[in-house]
Design a protein with these regions (language model features):
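An intracellular "coupling" helix at the cytosolic face of ABC transporter transmembrane type-1 domains
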Residues: 5-54, 97-100, 117, 140-145
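Helix-loop junctions and hydrophobic alpha-helical segments within the transmembrane domains
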Residues: 7, 28, 108, 242-244
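Conserved catalytic Walker-motif region of ABC-type ATPase nucleotide-binding domains
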Residues: 20, 108, 134-136
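Helix-loop-helix
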Residues: 33-106, 111
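Short, solvent-exposed loop/turn elements at beta->coil junctions and helix N-caps
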Residues: 121-125
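ABC-type nucleotide-binding domain
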Residues: 127-376
């Protein structure tokens, strides 16, 4: 139901209703066919059972008349035969249930036996308070193997430094985050932290050092406390509230009827975009990461929400290595260093003022943004 407003705004209720009815009818046809097959199988089993019973009683009756067996023996045999026959008749129903269960189990087994494409064979514990370095990284997504997302990408980031990645769409900025989180591994080159290749480190321990705040934060269908505490190790109420205060979220949470126990709905549908973003920031703060990844965290926010998020980010970024993806250059002017990317490579890097005189691509991006802001 999270897209109900989109359906209503485009006046597509009738079309969605028609599609729903069509899908229900298709499901009904399948269910009716299954019921018919089950009824035929059950009827056939009952027919065989009753036919066998009639034949058995006829033969037994003849034997009683001719004195080969007593009526009591025939009655006992019929009684036990009915019990056994009924048990066999239920096998038709059990067989249908087994067929449905086998289909579901087959899909589950495919998931259970699937192996991760990212091998977690590393045993090293990541170092603390050290530098991050990309060394000649080359990468292409499996779906587009002939289109490199990163090509000879080289970048060094000192501990505690805030670095902003800017560039046109498709420059490879988000791919940098994908590789840092080891959703993929480089095809060539290496990513090193403290001099050690990420592939030599324990995947769980490495990811514990990172917190990601995406452009569209993912919230779960639970309460606010659950969403902020997600991933933390036995957090207390006080710790959750402290994280919310740093994220400038405590104030609006207190205005909700049930406070931190307020149910958010699917994807946090009951909150505004700025409020969802601050919940995601509070989650990142509570995890106390050494590396903070901000993926255009304020690009879709209004002015007031952006101010609150920027204030929270200023506090969070203290003494943490921070990498920021931003299309709005005004949000990263104060970064320690701005790295300009294009076609998967580092084109230039430096502070804002320096890039405005030395990098034509950065100048063009800044000019286009300035014109857009003036037009608005």
């Amino acid at each position: 139901f999270q897209s109900i407003k989109v359906v209503q705004s485009f006046n597509e209720e009738i079309a969605e209703k028609t599609a729903f009815v069509r899908n229900v009818e298709q499901a009904f046809v399948v269910a009716r066919s299954r019921v018919l097959q089950r009824a035929l199988l059950t009827g056939f089993a009952i027919f065989l059972l009753m036919g066998g019973m009639v034949g058995m009683m006829w033969s037994g009756g003849v034997d009683v008349i001719e004195g080969r067996m007593t009526g009591g023996e025939l009655g006992a045999f019929v009684f036990y035969a009915i019990i056994v026959g009924t048990a066999f008749a239920t096998l038709s129903e059990v067989w249908g249930d087994l067929q449905r269960a086998a289909g579901a189990a087959e899909r589950l087994m495919e998931l259970l036996v699937a192996t991760s494409e990212i091998p977690d064979t590393g045993t090293q514990t990541p170092a603390s308070n050290t530098a991050l370095a990309f060394k000649g990284v080359h990468f292409a997504y499996p779906s587009r193997p002939t289109h490199p997302a990163l090509s000879d990408f080289t970048l060094e980031i000192a501990h505690g430094e805030s670095v902003a990645l800017v560039g046109p769409s498709g420059a490879g900025k988000s791919t940098v985050f994908e590789l840092m989180l080891r959703f993929y591994d480089p095809i060539a080159g290496a990513i090193r932290f403290g001099g050690a290749d990420l592939r030599e480190m324990s995947l769980d321990r490495w990811r514990q050092k990172i917190a990601l705040v995406p452009q569209q934060p993912s919230l779960f269908s639970g309460d606010i406390f659950y969403n902020i505490a997600y991933g933390a190790n036995e957090p207390t109420q006080a710790a959750v509230e402290a994280a919310a205060q740093m994220a400038h979220a405590h104030e609006f949470i207190q205005t909700l009827p049930e406070g931190y126990q307020s149910y958010l709905g699917a994807q946090g549908v009951r909150l505004s975009g700025g409020q969802r973003q601050r919940i995601a920031l509070a989650r990142a703060i509570l995890s106390d990461p050494e590396l903070l990844l901000l993926d255009e965290a304020t690009s879709a926010l209004d002015t007031e929400s952006e101010w609150h998020v920027q204030q929270a980010l200023t506090d969070i970024m203290q003494e943490r290595t921070t990498i920021i993806i931003a299309h709005r250059l005004s949000t990263v002017i104060n970064a320690d260093r701005i790295v300009v990317m294009d076609k998967g490579r580092v084109i230039d890097s430096g502070p804002h003022d320096e890039l405005m005189t030395s990098c034509k691509l950065y100048q063009r991006l800044a000019r286009l943004q300035f014109q857009t802001e003036q037009a608005s």
